[in-house]
Amino acid sequence: MSLPFLTSAPGKVIIFGEHSAVYNKPAVAASVSALRTYLLISESSAPDTIELDFPDISFNHKWSINDFNAITEDQVNSQKLAKAQQATDGLSQELVSLLDPLLAQLSESFHYHAAFCFLYMFVCLCPHAKNIKFSLKSTLPIGAGLGSSASISVSLALAMAYLGGLIGSNDLEKLSENDKHIVNQWAFIGEKCIHGTPSGIDNAVATYGNALLFEKDSHNGTINTNNFKFLDDFPAIPMILTYTRIPRSTKDLVARVRVLVTEKFPEVMKPILDAMGECALQGLEIMTKLSKCKGTDDEAVETNNELYEQLLELIRINHGLLVSIGVSHPGLELIKNLSDDLRIGSTKLTGAGGGGCSLTLLRRDITQEQIDSFKKKLQDDFSYETFETDLGGTGCCLLSAKNLNKDLKIKSLVFQLFENKTTTKQQIDDLLLPGNTNLPWTS
């Protein structure tokens, strides 16, 4: 496989259905097109090594090829590896034990889980690759509930499946459905390495992009990934994503809601949860209609605008329902109130609540000056971090060595970008963002 090449995958937000999804109600998640992980796969400067460089978490580690030989060349261990390569529904504890010595030096939690995810997928997907450096850059805030770990897992899975010859070729022009299925399967394994029991939602959104509808199985309480309903032709919806930096415990928030549902007010909570599920169903229906309503005549434009206003109204309603069950936070309400005061659009919390992030779908009649004023006040007065992006958009994608080598100036800039430890989001977007540059990403 020719080097260097790049892979990328987006983050995600929950549009509708936070908390109600726990009680088997439908929910909708979507990719965040401009918040992404980028992975550069290049030749390592140190011979006979595999290197992982992830400056966002201050992590760089090299493993010797000899570290892997005990797994790949020993007859008994290679049989254990072969079993793990076939077991795409869960982690092989035999392989986990074989990887323990390679992780022994890593005590910091972030570093350990990043390395565990990396090594598990590496030995399963491209165990004979050598002299390779994996360099990660992300424009996603880590730990904000925006699917940063899934974005990383998908980027790694795509790169390693490509290196291992499981998908595509040097002349890869399009990722097939089977390619994406393989990537999603292994990214889910990567998520298991990091989180233990992930839902499968984050990696699916990061792989396929756009949006999906999901709900728990009422019989066993798990999310059946085979029942995901993907919205492929998703309308680009402009939004401001705001990260409050307010820490929160998803576990505590879910437990607090559970007390309301099962102990204190079950009859009150039932219609609220039902309404949240209905927001998800109607929201998906509206977005589907928006994606199909593309005419330029007066009637089509009017219909499109009416649908968009309905979507904004549903966002407002869903946030109100979340407030009613006690999962908002004064810091989130500041954003909601400011967006209402400035008539920017409709704001709701996204994710577990209690802090974290909000999304603001923007009205169509506002100016860039109004948007900038909104962002500036949030940043200057409250030290929040804002991201102007679109809801939905490209999922995982790959920039082959063939395409990267076509422009040596761009190639040089890419390497400079990854070597610079203090690269800004704007610098990354200007050079790499799919759809924002002329780079021929394959998706």
UniProtKB/Swiss-Prot annotation:
Any one cellular-component term (Gene Ontology): cytosol
Active site, renumbered: 202 (proton acceptor)
Miscellaneous comment as given in the Swiss-Prot or TrEMBL entry: Present with 3300 molecules/cell in log phase SD medium.
Keyword Iron-sulfur: no
UniProt-listed Enzyme Commission number(s): 2.7.1.36
Native source species: Saccharomyces cerevisiae (strain ATCC 204508 / S288c) (Baker's yeast)
Record's keyword annotation contains Kinase: yes
Task of the protein: Mevalonate kinase; part of the second module of ergosterol biosynthesis pathway that includes the middle steps of the pathway. ERG12 converts mevalonate into 5-phosphomevalonate. The second module is carried out in the vacuole and involves the formation of farnesyl diphosphate, which is also an important intermediate in the biosynthesis of ubiquinone, dolichol, heme and prenylated proteins. Activity by the mevalonate kinase ERG12 first converts mevalonate into 5-phosphomevalonate. 5-phosphomevalonate is then further converted to 5-diphosphomevalonate by the phosphomevalonate kinase ERG8.
Obligatory cofactor(s): Mg(2+)
InterPro entries the record matches: GHMP_kinase_C_sf (IPR036554), GHMP_kinase_N_dom (IPR006204), GHMP_knse_ATP-bd_CS (IPR006203), Mev_gal_kin (IPR006205), Ribosomal_Su5_D2-typ_SF (IPR020568), Ribsml_uS5_D2-typ_fold_subgr (IPR014721)
Designated name of the protein: Mevalonate kinase
Highest taxon in the source lineage: Eukaryota
GO molecular function: ATP binding; magnesium ion binding; mevalonate kinase activity
Gene3D superfamilies: 3.30.230.10, GHMP kinase, C-terminal domain (3.30.70.890)
Taxonomic lineage from the root: Eukaryota, Fungi, Dikarya, Ascomycota, Saccharomycotina
Oligomer status and interactors: Homodimer.
Pathway: Isoprenoid biosynthesis; isopentenyl diphosphate biosynthesis via mevalonate pathway; isopentenyl diphosphate from (R)-mevalonate: step 1/3
